[in-house]
Regions:
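Short, solvent-exposed helix-to-loop capping segments enriched in aromatics
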Residues: 31, 116-129
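Sec/Tat-exported extracytoplasmic proteins
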Residues: 31-35, 88, 130-133
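N-terminal leader/targeting segments and the immediate start of mature chains
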Residues: 2-51, 56-61, 140, 203-205, ...
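An acidic-aromatic
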Residues: 55-117, 189-192
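Extracytoplasmic/secreted envelope proteins and their assembly/folding machinery
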Residues: 24-28, 119-123, 168
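Gly/Pro-enriched, hydrophobic low-complexity segments
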Residues: 70-75, 85, 124, 128-212
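Short amphipathic alpha-helical segments that mediate assembly, nucleic-acid/protein binding
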Residues: 4, 24, 102-105, 119
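Short linear motifs in intrinsically disordered
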Residues: 27-33, 53-55, 64-65, 73-77, ...
């Protein structure tokens, strides 16, 4: 896993995140060079736990393959049509639904919309929060065998972006992607804990993955 991340960083031109005077801005700049990525997401929140295989293609194509709950379900967002195709029992199987990304039945258990689910949107929300607050860099740590940079971004009193008042991030030192994120509301309660695993960056994904 570590060697794969190092290789991905080399191929994408990522510089070590600790070398950047502003790690969050460095991670955002690097994300702009990313054309594709795939990752396994584990999300824990008050509504339960979700495991998803997640695929992204610029400028915003998203494919989600659900591991739990709803094992086998596939959801694809197309930024050109601004529609979501949903196969509850697997891509190509009946039924296939066409839905708005605003539809409540396809939001995550934590309320996330598929068209707002990519790492770029996460980074932009955190940057907007920092502009109305502050951030603290806690330094390098080891998380699941990976070197990560631990930082916390907190809005001023009463300030929240996308319902989040505080974001605690562990940024992978090589890939500059979040390895873990904990979001909290204005009362300090945890909204969601997200772990990202098995990351691959800029390995070309076939067009048929997003248009089966």
């Amino acid at each position: 896993m570590i060697s794969a991340l190092i290789l991905a960083a080399a191929l994408t031109g990522a510089s070590p995140i600790g070398a950047h005077s502003d790690p969050l801005s460095g991670a955002i700049e690097h994300f702009r060079t990313v054309e594709y990525y795939r990752v396994t997401i584990r999300s824990i929140h008050a509504g339960g736990e979700e495991h998803i295989r997640y695929y992204y293609k610029k400028p915003g194509f998203v494919r989600m393959e659900f591991i739990r709950p709803h094992a086998g379900a596939v959801m694809i967002y197309n930024p050109d049509t601004k529609r979501v195709r949903l196969w509850p029992f697997g891509a190509g199987n009946f039924p296939e639904l066409s839905l708005s990304p605003e539809n409540s039945i396809i939001r995550s258990l934590s309320g996330m919309r598929v068209d707002h689910s990519d790492v770029g949107t996460l980074f932009e929300n955190i940057r907007a929060l920092r502009e109305q607050g502050d951030n603290e860099v806690l330094g390098e740590e080891t998380l699941d065998g990976r070197t990560v940079l631990h930082l916390i971004v907190t809005g001023r009193e009463g300030v929240a972006v996308a319902d989040v008042h505080s974001s605690e991030l562990w940024l992978d030192a090589k890939s500059q992607f979040p390895a873990k994120v904990i979001s909290r509301d204005i009362h300090g309660a945890i909204i969601e804990t997200v772990m990202m695993e098995a990351l691959e960056i800029n390995g070309k994904l076939p067009d048929t993955l997003f248009n089966p």
